[in-house]
């Protein structure tokens, strides 16, 4: 993946805890094109790499806009970019990748965003409007002051945007009404906290929507009980090395400690950067990147979070 040097051109305080960072090329050239739903890897000065969705219209090549929530429970990514970066500072980023594309057969769309989940959804709204595809956007927030990109939403999508504010009965969403029209060319896109997304997905499935019509973007992997973790052994194809992975470490950590180079990014099983081929053994899949069908093949796994059901896992790092 190609990395680029960009400059933080502007910083906007969207809400008390969300800032938008407008990024431009350091050499003045256009930035690589992207599609709605794309994200970029941001390599931070504290050594962490984090993924942030692009929120601006994909027809713009002079800038990228990312929205970053300052999470008090952050592992260091959002805290670093909020506290340690100012306008004019340089950032190293990767080229855009898209794991949350608008389905090619979408003729009508329903967009759901919860909190910071508006970031990829906003870019989708721009794209759908440009393509003249009918859509509605339902944005759920805890309070009015927590609405990110309020000006953009009300200016560009006055007929499509619906704000749903917690504990305000007049803004509550009637899910059954929103989801009552079930048609093969109608697709649903959702991004936000895990519980919110599960609620939307469950509601749609109960209303008769098929899995092929439902699309979601994870920012944080669902919590997994680690108390039952067991140690296992990794054998690296082409070497005589046997790497012991303790119950309290990830496969990636064990491999790096023993000198093996494993690309990592999100460290949560979201981005797919670390996917590694499995030669033999059975992985214990804990990622949200691969599909159930891909998991069933057991021919690859994400060492940043997944483990092994078998005692030994033989992998290919070539």
From Swiss-Prot:
Cofactor entry: FMN
According to the entry, every stretch annotated as the 2Fe-2S ferredoxin-type domain falls at 232-318
Q: Which GO terms describe its molecular function?
A: 2 iron, 2 sulfur cluster binding; metal ion binding; oxidoreductase activity
UniProt: NAD(+) binding residues: 107-220
Which BP terms does GO give this entry?
A: lignin catabolic process
Q: In which pathway does it act?
A: Xenobiotic degradation; vanillyl-alcohol degradation
One Pfam family matching this protein: DmmA-like_N
**Family classification:** Belongs to the PDR/VanB family.
**Name of the protein:** Vanillate O-demethylase oxidoreductase
């Amino acid at each position: 993946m190609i990395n680029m040097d960009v400059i933080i051109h502007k910083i906007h305080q969207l809400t008390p805890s969300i800032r938008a960072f407008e990024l431009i090329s350091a050499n003045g050239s256009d930035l690589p094109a992207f599609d709605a739903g794309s994200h970029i890897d941001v390599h931070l000065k504290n050594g962490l790499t984090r993924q942030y969705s692009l929120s601006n219209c994909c027809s713009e090549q002079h800038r990228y806009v990312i929205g970053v929530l300052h999470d008090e429970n952050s592992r260091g990514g959002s805290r670093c970019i909020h506290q340690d970066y100012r306008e004019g500072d340089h950032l190293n980023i990767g080229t855009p990748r898209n794991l949350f594309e608008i389905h090619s057969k979408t003729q009508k769309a329903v967009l759901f965003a919860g909190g910071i989940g508006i970031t990829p959804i906003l870019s989708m709204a721009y794209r759908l409007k440009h393509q003249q595809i009918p859509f509605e956007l339902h944005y759920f927030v805890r309070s009015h002051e927590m609405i990110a990109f309020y000006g953009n939403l009300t200016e560009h999508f006055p007929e499509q945007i619906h704000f749903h504010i917690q504990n305000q009965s007049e803004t509550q969403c009637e899910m059954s009404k929103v989801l009552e029209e079930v048609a093969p060319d109608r697709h649903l896109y959702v991004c936000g906290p895990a519980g919110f997304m599960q609620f939307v997905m469950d509601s749609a499935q109960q209303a008769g929507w098929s899995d092929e019509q439902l699309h979601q973007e994870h920012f944080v992997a669902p919590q997994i009980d680690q108390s039952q973790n067991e140690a296992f052994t990794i054998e690296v194809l082409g070497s005589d090395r046997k790497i012991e992975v303790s119950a309290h470490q990830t496969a990636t950590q064990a491999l790096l400690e023993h000198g093996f180079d494993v690309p990592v990014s999100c460290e949560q099983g979201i981005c797919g950067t670390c996917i590694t081929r499995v030669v033999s053994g059975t992985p214990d899949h804990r990622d949200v990147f691969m599909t159930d069908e891909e998991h069933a093949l057991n021919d690859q796994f994400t060492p940043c979070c997944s483990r092994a059901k078998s005692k030994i896992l033989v992998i290919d790092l070539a």
